[in-house]
C-alpha cells in the first residue's frame, strides 16, 4: 500500500518523495537566507579584467573582478575574485570582501581626522568635510567611501591612477582612522581637550 514500508526494509516511493521534499525545503531556506544577507549590503564592481595564461595547448582565459561591499553604516570590505566567467569572478570577489570587513570611524557622516593612505604606487589624501559637502572623490576611491556610508568628505588621488592601487590606498587610509576616545585615552587627556569643537558639536547633535 502507498506510504507503507516494505518487508525488506526499503521505503516506498511516497516516503522517498517526502524525504526529498524536506531536503529541497532546507536548501531553499538556506538559499533564501543567503540572498537576504546579500541584499543588506551595497556591492560595487570597480573593475573587471580579462587575463590569459599560456599553456601547452594555447591560451587559457579567465576574468578578475575587484568588488567593494559595505553596509552603508560604517562597515566596508574589498575583495578580488578570479574565475572563468565574469559572474563567478564577481561572486568570489564579493565573498572575499565580506570576509575583509572593517569598521570606519565616523562622526556626523564624515571621517574623524585627515589621513593619507598609501598602497604600492597609489596615494589617496582624505579630509573631513562639513555637512552638505557630499562625497568629493573620483575614480575608484568614490565607491569605497559610498559603500562605507561616508556622506561628506574631501578626497584626492595623488599617485597612480590604477584602480586597484587607488582602492587599496583608500582602504589603507580608512584603516588608519581613530575614534576621538581612543586618541584621548592614548594621550591621557579628556575628549574635550583632544577633539575639535566642531566635532564635539556634531557628536552632541547626533546623540540628540
Curated annotation (Swiss-Prot):
SUPFAM superfamilies: dsRNA-binding domain-like, Ribosomal protein S5 domain 2-like. Residues 41-104 form the S5 DRBM domain. One of its GO terms (molecular function) is structural constituent of ribosome. Residues 1-38 are annotated as: Disordered. GO terms for cellular component: small ribosomal subunit. Pfam families: Ribosomal_S5, Ribosomal_S5_C. The keyword rRNA-binding applies. One of its GO terms (biological process) is translation. Keywords: Ribonucleoprotein, Ribosomal protein, RNA-binding, rRNA-binding. InterPro entries: Ribosomal_Su5_D2-typ_SF (IPR020568), Ribosomal_uS5 (IPR000851), Ribosomal_uS5_bac-type (IPR005712), Ribosomal_uS5_C (IPR005324), Ribosomal_uS5_N (IPR013810), Ribosomal_uS5_N_CS (IPR018192), Ribsml_uS5_D2-typ_fold_subgr (IPR014721). It comes from the Bacteria. The keyword RNA-binding applies. The N-terminal domain interacts with the head of the 30S subunit; the C-terminal domain interacts with the body and contacts protein S4. The interaction surface between S4 and S5 is involved in control of translational fidelity. Part of the 30S ribosomal subunit. Contacts proteins S4 and S8. With S4 and S12 plays an important role in translational accuracy. Belongs to the universal ribosomal protein uS5 family. NCBIfam families: rpsE_bact. PANTHER family: MITOCHONDRIAL RIBOSOMAL PROTEIN S5. This is Small ribosomal subunit protein uS5.
Amino acid at each position: 500500500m502507498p506510504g507503507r514500508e516494505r518487508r525488506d526494509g526499503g521505503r516506498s516511493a511516497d516516503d522517498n518523495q517526502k524525504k526529498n521534499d524536506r531536503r529541497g525545503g532546507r536548501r531553499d531556506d538556506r538559499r533564501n537566507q543567503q540572498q537576504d544577507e546579500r541584499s543588506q549590503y551595497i556591492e560595487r564592481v570597480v573593475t573587471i579584467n580579462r587575463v590569459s595564461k599560456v599553456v601547452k595547448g594555447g591560451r587559457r582565459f579567465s576574468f578578475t573582478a575587484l568588488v567593494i561591499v559595505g553596509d552603508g553604516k560604517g562597515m566596508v570590505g574589498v575583495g578580488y575574485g578570479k574565475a572563468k566567467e565574469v559572474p563567478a569572478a564577481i561572486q568570489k570577489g564579493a565573498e572575499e570582501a565580506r570576509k575583509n570587513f572593517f569598521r570606519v570611524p565616523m562622526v556626523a557622516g564624515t571621517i574623524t581626522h585627515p589621513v593619507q593612505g598609501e598602497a604600492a604606487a597609489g596615494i589617496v589624501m582624505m579630509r573631513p568635510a562639513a555637512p552638505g559637502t557630499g562625497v568629493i572623490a573620483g575614480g575608484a576611491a568614490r565607491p569605497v567611501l559610498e559603500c562605507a556610508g561616508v556622506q561628506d568628505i574631501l578626497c584626492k588621488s595623488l599617485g597612480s591612477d590604477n584602480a586597484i592601487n587607488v582602492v587599496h590606498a583608500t582602504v589603507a587610509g580608512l584603516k588608519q582612522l581613530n575614534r576621538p576616545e581612543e586618541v584621548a585615552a592614548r594621550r591621557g587627556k579628556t575628549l574635550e581637550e583632544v577633539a575639535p569643537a566642531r566635532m564635539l558639536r556634531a557628536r552632541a547633535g547626533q546623540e540628540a
